[in-house]
Every structure is written in C-alpha cells, then in structure tokens.
C-alpha cells in the first residue's frame, strides 16, 4: 500500500504522456489530515532543479497538503521557465484540489536540461486528481520510476499508527542523497520538529550511505508527511526507529535495483577513531572503480581495498589494517592474510569489512559492482 498505508492519505499514478513510451509518469499524494505536518531533506548538490528550489520553500511553512511527482523529465538546468513550470504545476494541483499552492510540493526526475511538456503535464494533474484513492499507493510508486526495473515501497505498522513510503532510484546513487525521490507518510500525530528530527536521523544512516556510482543528482527529494489521523502520538525514539526502518528498507531496494549491477556490496568499516573517519573510508572503498570491477569479476582483490583506504585522511597505521571479504580475512596487519581462494563470491551479496584498528567507531556504506550493462545503459540514456 506504500504511501496510502497510513490513514489520511490518498494517492494516484497515471500516464500523462510525459514519457514517450506511454508508461505511467505522474504521481500525486494528498494529505487529508486532520492535523498536517511535514519535513523534508533535499540534495546537497549546488546545482538544484527547479522543483527542489520550489519544495524547499514549501517546507519552510511546515505543511504539505499534496506532493505531485513526475518522471520522464528532471526540470533541472531549465532556467526561469523551468521554475515557472514548477509553479504552474503546483498551482494546477492547488486549483483542482482547492488547496494553497504554497502547500504543494513538487518533485521531478529524468533527463536534465529539458523542459517538461506542460501541455501534457497540466491536463495530467486533473486526471491524477480524479484517480485519487486510499489504495493508490502502488500506482503512485510505479509512476515515479525512470530506469528502475521495479517499484519500491515499504511499510512499518506499530500500535495504532503506521509509517509507509515509496522511492525511486536506480542510477546516480550517491550521498547527499541519491537520484531518488522518496515520499514517506505517517498517521502519527506529530509536529514538524518531531518529523524533522526523525527524518534527518534516518537519512544520515540510510539514504546518505547508499553510494552506487558516486554521482550526485540535482533532484534528490525526501519528504515525510504526517496526517495525525491515528490520533496517536508515539514516543520520539519509537517513531524515529520506524522512520529509519522504512528508509533502510527503501535504501536496500535502491541498491538491489541499481543500474546494470550484478553484485550488491556492503562495505563495513570498523575500528575507526571517529565516525567521520569510518564514513570517509567506507565511501572511498565504495567509489573505487578498480575494486568494483574486481568484485564484478568475483576477484577478492584486497589490495584495492587498502589502496582506497590509503587515499583518505582517516587515522590508521598501514601495518595494522585488516580486510575481510565474505568472512575471509584476506589481509591481516597490512599484508597477506588467509588464502583468497577461500572467498566464495558466487552470490550477489558481497560483504567487505575494513578494520582500521584505530578505535571503536563504525559505519556501513552500500554500493554495487561496475558492469558493462551499467556503461551501456548510461551511454545511451539521452538517446
């Protein structure tokens, strides 16, 4: 049920004609209350798409009555006209639903540098409104796909309240956040500050640690909407954990559907002096293309792990580093460890542990291997 699992929400997904292949490309999520609150996290890319700039302003009000999302065009790097189109989209949603346009968030995903076909999008909004349903979450999740092969949803149900969510993303997955659009909903009765604390804590250890290809999008948007319909106010810790669980599940689905990937790689850094050190090392390993190619070839090349660690500013002694691949400590104290032939890499999941032997802090980054399919898909993306 995705975003409609929580009480107080309706959603829809339709084909407005934005995509040339005729697939669904316009989603709408509406918060029917009774007590609305919202929080959001956006890309840290300095080049921000028009819908990101618009939605950042909307979130300052702390209330989001509706979110309209299109796939098939990012509306990024489109100048003043692109922002005008975003404004017009919000106005159309507001007019059709009798809302305030300043409470309508907008999100877009697709090719950068191309204006959206507003002659198709605006009539599509009317059809999306007509299709709103308490069971429309799956259709909405399908409509935001781009190169995704599957739609991504998640739900956590607690004692009298629920957190649900949908996500899209398959390429340009990198910290800050990852080419992804995410809408989370809850019927818990919470204010914007409680939502903001929970969302930022969740994204820090989930979406921000998904690093499929090291490319940061212009459009990343994660929204958390509360309706208050359950009339239950959970403890902050319990709510934050539910949001984290949904984000973690969606993040894993993003990695599993990464473009062209044949291996899902969990990079776990342990024994770091600080968490920042652990994250920096994890990112360096996850972004090492030589290592990603080796993993694709089922080669447990621990030397490339050490090489990646060595490019960081983290505290460690080279002769104290240890590396395990799928449970085999192939590197011990900076040199040869157990027999690398013992490493079984036949399966999709690959687990790398890098022990810095410099402290007690840890961090985990998720990435993928680098394949010919990834290169092919992205070399032909705009053609």
Swiss-Prot record:
Disulfide bonds: none annotated. It comes from the Bacteria. Pathway: Amino-acid biosynthesis; L-arginine biosynthesis; L-ornithine and N-acetyl-L-glutamate from L-glutamate and N(2)-acetyl-L-ornithine (cyclic): step 1/1; Amino-acid biosynthesis; L-arginine biosynthesis; N(2)-acetyl-L-ornithine from L-glutamate: step 1/4. Its EC number is 2.3.1.35, 2.3.1.1. SUPFAM superfamilies: DmpA/ArgJ-like. CDD domains: OAT (cd02152). Its main location: cytoplasm. InterPro entries: Arg_biosynth_ArgJ, ArgJ-like_dom_sf, ArgJ_beta_C. It holds the Pfam family ArgJ. GO terms for cellular component: cytoplasm. It is found in: Cytoplasm. The record marks 178-179 as: Cleavage. Substrate binds at residues 146, 168, 179, 259, 378, 383. GO terms for molecular function: glutamate N-acetyltransferase activity; L-glutamate N-acetyltransferase activity. Keywords: Acyltransferase, Amino-acid biosynthesis, Arginine biosynthesis, Autocatalytic cleavage, Cytoplasm, Multifunctional enzyme, Transferase. It catalyses: N(2)-acetyl-L-ornithine + L-glutamate = N-acetyl-L-glutamate + L-ornithine; L-glutamate + acetyl-CoA = N-acetyl-L-glutamate + CoA + H(+). The active site is at 179 (nucleophile). Catalyzes two activities which are involved in the cyclic version of arginine biosynthesis: the synthesis of N-acetylglutamate from glutamate and acetyl-CoA as the acetyl donor, and of ornithine by transacetylation between N(2)-acetylornithine and glutamate. Heterotetramer of two alpha and two beta chains. Belongs to the ArgJ family. NCBIfam families: ArgJ, PRK05388.1. This is Arginine biosynthesis bifunctional protein ArgJ. It comes from Streptomyces avermitilis (strain ATCC 31267 / DSM 46492 / JCM 5070 / NBRC 14893 / NCIMB 12804 / NRRL 8165 / MA-4680). The lineage of its organism: Bacteria, Bacillati, Actinomycetota, Actinomycetes, Kitasatosporales.
């Amino acid at each position: 049920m995705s975003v409609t699992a929580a009480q107080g929400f309706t959603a829809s997904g339709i084909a407005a004609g934005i995509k040339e292949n005729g697939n669904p490309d316009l989603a709408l999520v509406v918060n029917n209350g009774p007590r609305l609150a919202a929080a959001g996290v956006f890309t840290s890319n300095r080049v921000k798409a028009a819908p990101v700039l618009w939605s950042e302003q909307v979130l300052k009000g702390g209330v989001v009555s509706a979110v309209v999302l299109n796939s098939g065009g990012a509306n990024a790097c489109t100048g003043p006209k692109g922002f005008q189109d975003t404004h017009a989209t919000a106005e159309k949603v507001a007019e059709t639903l009798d809302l305030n346009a300043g409470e309508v968030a907008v999100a877009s995903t697709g090719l950068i540098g191309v204006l959206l076909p507003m002659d198709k999008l605006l009539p599509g909004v009317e059809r999306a409104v007509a299709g709103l349903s308490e069971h429309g979450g799956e259709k909405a999740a399908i409509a935001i796909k781009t190169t995704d092969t599957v739609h991504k949803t998640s739900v956590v149900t607690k004692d009298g309240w629920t957190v649900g969510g949908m996500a899209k993303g398959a390429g340009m997955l990198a910290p800050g956040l990852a080419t992804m659009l995410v809408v989370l909903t809850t019927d818990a009765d919470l204010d914007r500050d409680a939502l903001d604390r929970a969302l930022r804590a969740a994204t820090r250890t989930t979406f921000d640690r998904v690093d499929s290809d090291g490319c940061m999008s212009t459009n990343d948007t994660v929204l958390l909407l509360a309706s208050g319909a359950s009339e239950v106010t959970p403890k902050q810790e319990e709510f934050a954990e539910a949001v984290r669980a949904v984000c973690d599940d969606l993040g894993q689905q993003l990695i599993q559907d990464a473009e062209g990937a044949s291996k899902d790689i969990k990079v776990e850094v342990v024994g770091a002096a600080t968490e920042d050190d652990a994250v920096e090392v994890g990112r360096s390993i996850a972004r090492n293309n030589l290592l990603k190619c080796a993993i694709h070839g089922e080669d447990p090349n621990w030397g490339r792990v050490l090489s990646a660690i060595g490019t960081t500013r983290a505290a460690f002694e080279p002769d104290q580093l240890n590396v395990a691949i799928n449970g085999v400590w192939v590197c011990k104290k900076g040199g040869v460890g157990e027999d690398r032939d013992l490493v079984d890499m036949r399966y999709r999941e690959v687990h790398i542990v890098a022990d810095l032997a410099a402290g007690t802090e840890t961090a985990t980054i998720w990435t993928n291997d680098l394949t010919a399919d990834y290169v092919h898909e992205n070399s032909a993306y705009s053609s």
